[in-house]
Swiss-Prot record:
InterPro entries: DNA-dir_RpoC_beta_prime, DNA-dir_RpoC_beta_prime_bact, RNA_pol_asu, RNA_pol_N, RNA_pol_Rpb1_1, RNA_pol_Rpb1_3, RNA_pol_Rpb1_3_sf, RNA_pol_Rpb1_5
Annotated gene: rpoC
Stated role: DNA-dependent RNA polymerase catalyzes the transcription of DNA into RNA using the four ribonucleoside triphosphates as substrates.
Name by which UniProt lists this protein: DNA-directed RNA polymerase subunit beta'
Subunit-structure text: The RNAP catalytic core consists of 2 alpha, 1 beta, 1 beta' and 1 omega subunit. When a sigma factor is associated with the core the holoenzyme is formed, which can initiate transcription.
Enzyme class, first EC level, given as a word: transferase
Amino acid sequence: MLDVNVFDELRIGLATADDIRRWSKGEVKKPETINYRTLKPEKDGLFCERIFGPTRDWECACGKYKRVRYKGIICERCGVEVTKSKVRRERMGHIELAAPVTHIWYFKGVPSRLGYLLDLAPKDLDLIIYFGANIITSVDEEARHSDQTTLEAEMLLEKKDVEADAESDIAERAEKLEEDLAELEAAGAKADARRKVQAAADKEMQHIRERAQREIDRLDEVWQTFIKLAPKQMIRDEKLYDELIDRYEDYFTGGMGAESIEALIQNFDLDAEAEELRDIINNGKGQKKMRALKRLKVVAAFQRSGNDPAGMVLNAIPVIPPELRPMVQLDGGRFATSDLNDLYRRVINRNNRLKRMIELGAPEIIVNNEKRMLQESVDALFDNGRRGRPVTGPGNRPLKSLSDLLKGKQGRFRQNLLGKRVDYSGRSVIIVGPQLRLHECGLPKLMALELFKPFVMKRLVENEYAQNIKSAKRMVERQRPEVWDVLEEAISEHPVMLNRAPTLHRLGIQAFEPVLVEGKAIQLHPLACEAFNADFDGDQMAVHLPLSAEAQAEARVLMLASNNILSPASGKPLAMPRLDMVTGLYYLTLEKSSEEFGGQGAYQPADENGPEKGVYSSLAEAIMAYDRGVLGLQAPVRIRLNHLRPPAEVEAEQFPDGWNQGETWLAHTTLGRVMFNEILPWNYPYLEGIMVRKGGGSDKIMLGDVVNDLAAKYPMITVAQTMDKMKDAGFYWSTRSGVTIAMSDVLVLPNKEEMLDRYEESARQIEVKYNRGKLTGRERYDRLVELWKDATDEVGQAVEDLYPDDNPIPMIVKSGAAGNMRQIWTLAGMKGMVVNSKGDYITRPIKTSFREGLTVLEYFNNSHGSRKGLADTALRTADSGYLTRRLVDVAQDVIVRVEDCGTRQGVRVPVAAEVLDATGAVTGYTRHDLIETSVSGRVLAGDATNAAGEVVLAAGTDLTELNIDLLVEAGIKDVKVRSVLTCQTPTGVCAKCYGKSMASGQQVDIGEAVGIVAAQSIGEPGTQLTMRTFHQGGVGGDITGGLPRVQELFEARVPKNCAPIASVEGVIHLEDEGNFYTLTIVPDDGSDNVVYEKLSKRQGLASTRVAMESNAGAFIERTLTEGDRVTVGQRLLRGAADPHDVLEILGRRGVEQHLIDEVQAVYRAQGVAIHDKHIEIIIRQMLRRGTVIESGSTEFLPGSLVDLSEAKLANSEAIGAGGQPAELRSEIMGITKASLATESWLSAASFQETTRVLTDAAINKRSDKLIGLKENVIIGKLIPAGTGISRYRNISIKPTEAARNAAYSIPTYGESIYGDDGFGEFTGASVPLDEAF
């Protein structure tokens, strides 16, 4: 067996019959499997012990040798080797075929490799292989030439003989006729009778002449065919072929079936054929050249790889080990067997029958029929159903062939190699664990005991609770009391991994420290729900146990939930307070006027009646007042604080040298807000405002911004502790806020009827106008939709105004905990317009609210939209999953390989936007809208200089938030940044071009699998995207949006209703031609005009931005008209541009930007933030290859797709050797095509079209260098990413003294961060790897 860690590459090739015999331990001669009485394998059958090994360990078949001491002996009675029974998983047999057969993959695959090699059409091949026609395999030209005159003379003689025979026959018949006539005359017959006899004789003589002519024509045909006979000539006429064989078998060979194909391959000269094809390619053109190119690919593949093409025709077929196609006894004494056994039995039966027929010397037609059946049975074994009807088993179920075992989701690749089931795992329902800390999960005791069983048993023996493992096992099974104590020890500091399916991104698996809980449900921390997309309505999660010390360390350092607070897609926090917690924090930080709620302890300024009230000397005094009931939590107060840092403006004013703990300042705030600020680290500036999750405002503070800021300024451990405190406070105060929903909380508008009556009247007017023909159907529809939308808005606004602030429903919405105002409108106002199943509005709105209840008709109208929503969601989930799979596949080998590739290239991205005043003058600069997703977290590729030419930031600087602010202040509009699109690393990317990891905020580590993170970041929000195609009132047809648009872009498909783009800059001239326009661009440079014909009017001309004449700084949007100016790459019609056109006209950079903008447009429309770098990684993979136009002196074939980095290398070698470089054209490939074009055949085969990929790889003798992740998972190696790359794998750990000391000062979770220990300034949660080693 192969040692899994020893090889560096895996090659696949064509096996010849000799290889198959060499692998085999014996020939399978009988179709029998096992004896039904003894249940032992039959000798020489498909389960034979002599060939495949013993069924029992160390025991031969007859029982003469038993026990391990006879190891290696071959029993002289039964011939079975005494060894372990597991050899039955490894040993192969073979079947010697009585006639050769072709391998169906090479004959029936598209394109047919056999057909291309032999230059035969697949239809003809089919006829030859399945005994429908004969083919000439070789012709002895010399002998035919030298004997031609003799043969021709013989032929002429034969023709003369035929003519002479015919003449004599005719003469005989004429004689007989005369005799007959004489007899009739003598008998006195009438003329009529004589005429009949005459006519019959004439007819017969005519027959003789025709027969002779046919015979002569046949001889002519035989002769002409023989004269022109050439190899690979097909003869479909069976009789003609028999005639040729009878007469001239010494001069040629031929036949039908795989034997003739084998003969052709043996006579085939690869080098001569390749030479000839290259000649055609260089000198030919059109179809002939294209065919020669395709053929050369196959011929050159055999030449290069050294594969023997004879391997495509088999004389022996391998029999796979019996344990891989087992036969098991079921309860009722019946047997269940693998389909392969049935397929093998068919092959053996037919093969044996064919052997017997050949021995008996059966007629050729019977033998050929049997050979055809043998060919069909081998085809069914290799790939059932590829040709003709599939072979079926019981119940008409097609049998699973060898190909089917590899293909698809249930195939070997995806089911067993990429997706194995693992030990040490369990699953259960999840419930909320509000008492947990962020890095903990609650594990049911019974589940933990089962998972940690071996650890518990070991400790029971170590602690002398049990004498040996066996008794320890018994103790665990009986759940003795001491077992629980030992279990507590075993699980302490041993993280477990929790996973929730579907795992859409890497945060779908996180590590937690287990805490034992009663019951049978896993308890999950509420803040971890967002990342898992989990809720507690019956969701289940799986638990996995990292076993080795390295695995535990990785789980703790990389996967612990408290280290995964930020999203890898956008860098925004995922572990955010939500639902009840938000309500609680909102309630805690609300401020209400003293009259409304606050009691006598609220702040009142000094007046003539007395001094100011509600000023407290310390937080403790304020809490005392609250406890006594004289001060409300939300009442405005003044409190003197000395343990919390003041807000930035107060600090700047009162403490110019910076505030130190203990210095006092007066806070104008509420008691609740002080309590909230106590949750935050003590040196975090005081936050004065209402905490909300979404929907900002002047006095509102977004929780997300707070968490973001914390993550940027503090170590993760501090952030995690703060989040936990927020969670606790949120739950505590939401419980005390009394926010609940009752029917009485849903207030109903008193004057809704009056409002709606006004709109009803307007709707009636529209209907009247329509009935009188003053409006078209479309205008009526548009006006009614607008009218009722206005009605819904007015009613909704009235509902919002009706609700007081302390009503629980607006509290829930305003805090951002759940829902939105639209839902309140629906509950208490009116539902409004709904769509039908086509996606058009129903012109009757739903006028009732859910509180009042819908009428039957309204309920029916509403059900359309709801049903569409559910169907959409189901389709979207499947589509989104498939998109993620394709993205992962195309980007899986993009790994950060090096620190810096040293390139000076980059891409320009906008940083600052001008702020204009009313006159259009620039008054300052503000951040560009897209900074978050395009600029932040990158590295400058060139110096950023301001208008005066001074360097603000040097090349190589990281663009942090502070640095971006510097650029904006300096008024720098755009900068050149490093990007993966311009990275020069041949495989993977470099850390500088990638920038910072969004999940950590630090520069990305070497070994990070950024490709997969990119794929997950794009795929994970896929389910949120709509499936909609937007209707545009008949103009331009449907515009594809949402998920289908993203797929269309990544697959580089030509969009439906695609818009042509201008290939030159110039002025346009329009001609109207009925339903179409003809658009001409007159170029500025004076070159030839460019004409675009047949531009659809229905699609409509594109819009353009034109400066206003009245106002210099302003622009208006309008459609293109005569005389407008267009720039290169500008769209001429509405609709999406074709990426292939963009590549051709705007080049590589143009299409990169086009794809990024278009993909981001879809995600932004749904409010999803994804960093550009993720999309760039996918685009880099799509643009990696080019088509060879001229091969120069390189090895490439014209028309083939090659990796541009490989081509660059080959070109420099060619130039170095004084040759010509290859000429290439950039190509854009869809992600599916790009995945299949990968260098790794293992990765491509496990993705799609498995048989096609393997066929191609075998012919080319492809070698897989095992660079990507999938191929290493398949063969069971550590993946070459993360800690699996050699840089980390081959480390010898010797900590320095400094690192050893630092190790003891790492803060633990329990240490307080809020005390006076100065710990807040601490900046490193753990020792960096580089220092530790």
